[in-house]
Amino acid sequence: GKNMTAYEYGGDILIVDAGIMFPENDMLGIDYIIPDFDYLLDKANRVRGLVITHGHEDHIGAVRHVLEQIPTPVYATPLTLGLIEVKMARNGYNKKADLRTIQAGEKIQIGKFQVETFHVSHSIPDAVGLAITTGAGLIIHMSDFKLDNTPVDGWATDYAKLAEFS
C-alpha cells in the first residue's frame, strides 16, 4: 500500500501514483494511511504532474490528499481517471482538478520528463507501465503487473515495447 514515487530531474519533479494503505486490525480508529509526502511540500512549485498507473486504491486513494496541498495535473487512462473522479466527488473534493486523459502507447512531455505509457496486464483493466526519459537516461516504472498472455480485457503486457527499451 501507499504507493507513491517522486522522480527529480533538472529542477522538475514527477510523481507516480498516490495510494493509500489500509490499516492492520490492531490500528483501531484509523480508516486508511496516506504516504508521507512532506518532502514534496516545500518543492510543490517544482512538481510538474502526477501520473497514475492504474485504478487500485493503493495507487489512487491519496490523490485528493496530494492535490489539496500540491495542485498539479493528473494523468491517467480513461478507466483510472473515471475512478479518481468518482472517488474525489464522493469524498467531497470540491476544487477544480486538472485531470488529463492519456492512452496506453501515448508519449507526453511533463516538464523535463518524457513519459511513454505501455500496456501491462493486471487484475484491473487500463493499467499501464511507464517509460520515463530524462537527459540522464531511461527509467522503466512497472508498477503492478502480472504475466498473463490472455487477460480478460484483451490487453496483454506490451512485451515488444519492453524489448525496445532494453
Task: Spell out what each predicted region is.
Residues 1-51, 56-166:
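His/Asp/Glu-rich metal-coordinating catalytic cores
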